[in-house]
Amino acid sequence: MSILEVNGVKKVYSTRFGGARVEALKNVNFTVEAGEYVAIMGESGSGKTTLLNILAALDKPTAGTVMLEGNDLTAIRDKEVAAFRRDHLGFVFQEFNLLDTFTLEDNILLPAVLARLSYQEMQQRLKPLAQELGIADLLKKYPYEVSGGQKQRAAAARALIMKPRLILADEPTGALDSKATDELLGLFGRINAKGQTILMVTHSVKAASHAGRVLFIKDGEVFHQIYRGSSTNEQLYQKISDTLTMLATGGEQA
């Protein structure tokens, strides 16, 4: 069953004072099945960030539709967008986006507070989640008291606390060292194995090699995709590297 359907998405920006028009996305089409783990890759300027902003309901396409479980994101009224985003989507960012004056626990629970869940319900969700992510002993600490990897795990817990249908991850390993990267990718693998759908935008071949499918964006369109199939992470890593080389040299996919 498709959880996300992107159909004919186009995004055109006009420069200031009515100057030249920039076509960031031309004609993007793809679907994501429930329980899939999909990575999106492409060179800088290919349209990845624009696409992610549209999928996150932070921006609207010039043309086309984005359907999340039958809901057309492009048709949601502005005053309803924040609540829809909170109830259906979870976000993991490169820079963590934690509030320094909040403990990790308060950061994680913020979406639940905004959704007005009861204290009991929040704690019932928080405790097993913190245990799974290995941050149960850090909940009373502040972001500046923990490592980058621990911050990112707290950010992942915040993304999961509302049991979202889809996790959107934007360069989630970009600010992490090698050890923390391995830990986060392991975490993503575990939550995906439990049925969580993940869509990750990344420059990292290593991060993408943990996904089940990799989409490549070029010049505002989905240029190519690779399915994991029976490939190991190492084999998928090589396939991704070869495709990125082809993209960089202007080759065409047969």
Question: Which ranges hold each PLM region?
Answer:
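Conserved ABC transporter NBD signature motif
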Residues: 64-72
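ABC ATPase C-loop
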Residues: 135, 139, 159-160
